[in-house]
């Protein structure tokens, strides 16, 4: 079941509905980047083109967690 949250993106309020797992992953990625969740979503919003924002967030999260990990990164994980 999707969870709806309201975020302020560049001064505009918007609502976004994602599965709890995607919210958790987006929050984790934002934290790793030293960003707020809103700043993380805004970065995605600025590059999504005509794609639905919720879909763009899901794709960004999925792309991060399915990207190949270098051997050096694996050694320190």
Where are these regions (language model features)?
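Short, charged, intrinsically disordered terminal tails
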Residues: 1-3, 67-77
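Amphipathic, hydrophobic secondary-structure cores in small proteins
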Residues: 4-61
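Short, leucine/isoleucine-rich alpha-helical interaction segments at C-terminal helix-coil junctions
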Residues: 60, 64-68
